[in-house]
Amino acid sequence: MEGETLSDNLFLISVKLVNKDNQAFSQSYYMTGLEPTALSDVQRTFEAPEYETTVGIDLTKLDAAQIAAQIAQAKTMLPEGHSFKSVGSYQIEEDVPAGNSVFNRNKTFGKQHTSFVVRFTEDGKETESSAGKTSYIYYEAEVTVEPDGTLSIEEN
């Protein structure tokens, strides 16, 4: 996640983990030198992973060059007359069981999903001033990385 909107500077990395006792936790790491947050329990209503069946993200398969190529491709998918400004977040998630079975519909446990949010502006309309204040006007789109590596984009 970026720190300041439209800065394109990595600020925060959040991870979730599950231990052998099937307890799920989350923790955040700041790129500014701040100490990581304390481990906190994951809300089991929505995520109740089981250690034995959780695939997990293979960190050896994270490829910075591939991620950069995905971002470069997403830039070409923006509407004409708009300019890329930043990546708001980049997520790799795995479908895990929920504590409430209602939230398990349409899930394939172990299946991983990659997506990221791009932020962009309309050329010539990046700011708006009113009552002496200037606001930045930007749009967001979610980019989904399909299993075969192709990208699809949907404006939020």
Predicted regions and their residues:
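Generic detector of leucine side chains in alpha-helical contexts
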Residues: 6, 10-12, 17, 31-34, ...
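Glutamate identity and glutamate-enriched acidic tracts
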Residues: 2-4, 8, 35, 47-52, ...
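Long, charged/polar, surface-exposed segments that mediate recognition or autoinhibition
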Residues: 36-91
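A short, surface-exposed beta-strand/turn
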Residues: 23-48, 124-156
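Exposed beta-strand-loop-beta-strand "reactive/processing" segments of non-cytosolic proteins
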Residues: 1-28, 94-137
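A broad structural signal for short, well-ordered beta-strand segments within beta-sheet-rich domains
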Residues: 1, 6-12, 64, 68, ...
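Serine/threonine-rich low-complexity intrinsically disordered regions
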Residues: 58-63, 79, 97-104, 121-122, ...
